[in-house]
């Protein structure tokens, strides 16, 4: 009896050890029959990351995190809904304002009076400061001796800024969405062109010549 009980204990121990050594069936089971089991991917050291790895990591973070609409790139932001009840068919600018809401927009500004690049920098800086005080977020870039770009993050305010610029004394012209708007200082070049024309007319006018001949005839009579 003692020997048989001892033998049973040894057999139970061997069976238990075999069960422990066997891997679980989940390790070999797959969702689809015949699919090969891929070993787990070895984790890469972050010190060995290249630009492609960093881009994938950033993309994964963007998927996992909830990013606000204002922080998204412009091409990924949802378009603002358009309230057609507020549109005026007689004013095309009102339609453009609604469609450009929340989108970046640029306008070109030309300075009158043949300024230097430094003068253009100073003049446009004053305009930018006035717009900033009126709560308009505008960025400014000088692209020539008499030309600058005003860039807005919200294009719906572009036409209000255009109205401000064209009323400035040194603003010759504003170009917005392919449309050219003459400024208050746009007539300076035309005035400069008309001045020599007036001078030429005076020189070619026959009346002054007739008056000179009359003066000569009068002087001859006095001599006689």
Curated annotation (Swiss-Prot):
Indicate the quaternary assembly.
Monomer. Interacts with LRP5; the interaction prevents LRP5 from forming aggregates and chaperones LRP6 to the plasma membrane. Interacts with LRP6; the interaction prevents LRP6 from forming aggregates and chaperones LRP6 to the plasma membrane. Interacts with LRP4; the interaction promotes glycosylation of LRP4 and its cell-surface expression.
Provide the species name.
Rattus norvegicus
PANTHER family in the record: LRP CHAPERONE MESD (PTHR17600:SF2), MESODERM DEVELOPMENT CANDIDATE 2 (PTHR17600)
Its protein name is LRP chaperone MESD
- Mind telling me which Gene3D superfamilies this protein's record contains? 3.30.70.260, 6.10.250.640
Q: Where is this region: Disordered?
A: 178-224
List where the motif Prevents secretion from ER lies. Answer: 221-224
Signal peptide start-end: 1-29
Q: In UniProt terms, what function does this protein have?
A: Chaperone specifically assisting the folding of beta-propeller/EGF modules within the family of low-density lipoprotein receptors (LDLRs). Acts as a modulator of the Wnt pathway through chaperoning the coreceptors of the canonical Wnt pathway, LRP5 and LRP6, to the plasma membrane. Essential for specification of embryonic polarity and mesoderm induction. Plays an essential role in neuromuscular junction (NMJ) formation by promoting cell-surface expression of LRP4. May regulate phagocytosis of apoptotic retinal pigment epithelium (RPE) cells.
Q: What is known of its domains?
A: The chaperone domain provides a folding template for proper folding of the beta-propeller (BP) domains of LRP5/6.
Region feature Escort domain, mapped onto this chain:
156-195
- Keyword flag Signal: yes
A single Pfam family it belongs to is Mesd
Homology family: Belongs to the MESD family.
Instruction: Tell me a GO cellular component.
Output: endoplasmic reticulum
According to the record, the residues making up region (Chaperone domain) are 1-155
> Keywords, A to Z?
Chaperone, Endoplasmic reticulum, Glycoprotein, Signal, Wnt signaling pathway
Q: Where is the composition biased (Basic and acidic residues)?
A: 187-224
Picking any one GO biological process from the record gives: positive regulation of skeletal muscle acetylcholine-gated channel clustering
**Cellular compartment(s):** Endoplasmic reticulum
Any GO MF annotation of the entry: low-density lipoprotein particle receptor binding
Q: Which residues are glycosylated?
A: 192
């Amino acid at each position: 009896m003692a020997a048989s009980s001892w033998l049973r204990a040894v057999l139970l121990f061997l069976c238990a050890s075999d069960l422990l050594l066997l891997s679980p069936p989940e390790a070999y089971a797959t969702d689809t029959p015949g699919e090969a089991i891929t070993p787990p991917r070895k984790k890469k050291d972050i010190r060995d990351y290249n630009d492609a790895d960093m881009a994938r990591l950033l993309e994964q973070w963007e998927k996992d995190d909830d990013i606000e609409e204002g922080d998204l790139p412009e091409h990924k932001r949802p378009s603002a809904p358009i309230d057609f009840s507020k549109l005026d068919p007689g004013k095309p600018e009102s339609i453009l304002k609604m469609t450009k809401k929340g989108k970046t927009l640029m306008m070109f500004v030309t300075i009158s009076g043949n300024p230097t690049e430094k003068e253009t920098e100073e003049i446009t800086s004053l305009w930018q400061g006035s717009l900033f005080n009126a709560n308009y977020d505008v960025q400014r870039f000088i692209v020539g001796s008499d030309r600058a770009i005003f860039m807005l993050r919200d294009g719906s305010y572009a036409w209000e800024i255009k109205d401000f610029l064209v009323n400035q004394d040194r603003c010759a012209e504003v170009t917005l969405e392919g449309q050219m708007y003459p400024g208050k200082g746009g007539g300076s070049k035309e005035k400069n062109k008309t001045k020599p024309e007036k001078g030429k007319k005076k020189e070619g006018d026959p009346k002054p010549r007739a008056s000179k001949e009359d003066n000569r005839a009068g002087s001859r009579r006095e001599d006689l």
